[in-house]
Amino acid sequence: MANDGWEQGWHERNGGNLSYRVKPEEVEEVKENFEAREWNPIGTAVPNLAGEYFLVTGSGKYFRNVTIKPEDSICMIELDEKGENYRIVWGLVNGGRPTSELPSHLMNLEVKKLQDERYRVVYHAHTTNVIALTFVLPLEDKV
């Protein structure tokens, strides 16, 4: 998904971010590669996501590099049992932190999980053509 967005020109430099709520069976498939780091506050509480894992882009990282150097561009995080803290368990090998939008992504994913378990992705892009339309079309909800 990150590479598709890059190839379509949806991301200027490090603009945009992505988060995916990982399925338990997918976590089991890769858990042997985890190396837990220190816990960090999320900045909000998402109790309905407690104990879950998420694949997220790194802050300031380029979508272009996700397929080239995934271990440096993205990370897998685990939430604690209260949904108040996270820790990186894989990725961002050269340092860094998850997207600065992590709290809002997790809050959205929590709402979507309560509505329908199938919703697992938050994708934020700066699509140039859509941005350009904001200068051409009237700024009305009905458009």
Residue ranges and their predicted role:
Residues 1-143:
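Glycine-rich flexible loops
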